[in-house]
Amino acid sequence: MMTNRELLINAARAGEIAGKYYIAYGERDVNEGIDIGGGRLWNPLINNADAFSLMVRLYLDLDVRDYGILVNSPDTGVRYKQLVARGEDREKATRLAIVNCAAIIGENL
């Protein structure tokens, strides 16, 4: 299992997102992502638009089921399944599945 840092760096590599990993600790939260300039952090783990863009950029197939999220990369053969328990945040699980699939692709580049 990869850390958030590894997930973000490898997913960015797969998606050809240029930037450096950045993390800052606040009083109540952690602000992390890939610094893509202009004061913007790219973080598909928490941002639906970033996750969707990554999915489209990598031509990933997404299959949402009641038990989990399946992400498949036809170009590379990489597949990832994120199980989802009843009542769990399905959008968060979907973002996590997309990022994990992309990170596996990026790790192998």
Task: Identify the meaning behind each predicted range.
Residues M1-L109:
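Glycine-rich anion-binding surface patch
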